[in-house]
């Protein structure tokens, strides 16, 4: 049974390559996969196929968007699909294609899918060392503007099942302190002037391990820099 579905998935992929889905019953395939006890690898393969734009356009033209999306949600839940699987798959498929564009010191820097996944793994390994140091679950806080190192921490947490709490920069020091306490943040990553200012205003009564995402010279307390974190 699975080999038949595997064949049909291969036919869909070939149709995608040929840009012709006229003879492909996507809805029937999704419903069959949804109704049977299918291996996780096949579920992943189906979800891989479903991400192509030509598939979305085909479903939209058939006026079956709601049914399709409901099927996809069910398959995602059954497969336990997660951020790490998504990035890993994109790295395998798109390799050196650009995943992120970053402005760094006024210059455009690109990061490929393969490089991004490698960086996420490196960050995840560093985060796992925190888990080994304690017998209770850790909670990561992110007090930073949108920057690469912060993105890596966020993606690593989502990829490897670590609880992460983004903390808004537009709050007061009282708001920040409240979130740190009530979210039970155990490790806080700090970046940028605003993030640093908020931390300096609340750090005096916090026993939170703090890591600087970039420059740590202006931060108060015992701060681990990014390079030390990755060691």
Residue ranges and their predicted role:
Residues 154, 171-201:
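Conserved ATP-dependent adenylate/AMP-binding module captured primarily in the ANL superfamily
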Residues 161:
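Structured binding elements
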Residues 8-33, 196-231:
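ANL superfamily adenylate-forming
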Residues 40-58, 76-100, 118, 128:
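A short N-terminal helical cap/helix-turn-helix that marks the beginning
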Residues 96-134, 141-148, 155, 172-177, ...:
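Conserved AMP-binding/adenylate-forming core of the ANL superfamily
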Residues 57-61, 68, 86-112, 130, ...:
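AMP-dependent adenylate-forming
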Residues 144, 167-168, 191, 209-217:
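Short beta-strand elements of ligand-binding domains
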